[in-house]
A protein has these predicted regions:
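C-terminal functional extensions of proteins
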Residues: 45-115
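Short amphipathic alpha-helices and their capping/turn segments at secondary-structure boundaries
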Residues: 39-41, 45
Length: 115
């Protein structure tokens, strides 16, 4: 099994840095922001893929309710404190993955491993 993590584009402001998407169908990096990359899935790798995604960006027009001009590139924004949020959320994800894969470890053990 391969575990992949990716940043996602949020559909709503409320989901920005607030939800975690978990799927066994893999992912296509960049697809939420129009920058499609090669799919990472069971079909492409030949093994099960568990994908975790965290919405860290949102289209500006979703915040203001307007469409961007057709000739312009879409504008994506992040919260002002995105660096801190990503540090905290990635740590939370690391704890979850470690506890799921190594159930014999305690939270204290994992804290020692993560530093």
């Amino acid at each position: 099994c391969v575990i992949v993590l990716d940043a996602l584009a949020a559909a709503t402001r409320e989901k920005l840095c607030a939800v975690l998407q978990l799927t066994d169908t893999g992912l296509t990096p960049g697809s939420g922001v129009g920058n499609h990359r090669k799919e990472v899935s069971r079909r492409t790798l030949g093994v099960p893929v568990l994908a975790l995604g965290l919405p860290t960006v949102i289209r500006a027009e979703q915040l203001v309710g307007e469409e961007t001009p057709a000739e312009g590139e879409p504008l994506f924004v992040t919260p002002r404190d995105i660096d801190q949020r990503v540090r905290e959320l990635s740590r939370m994800m690391a704890y979850g993955i470690d506890l799921a894969l190594q159930p014999h470890l305690t939270v204290e053990d994992i804290t020692g491993l993560l530093g």
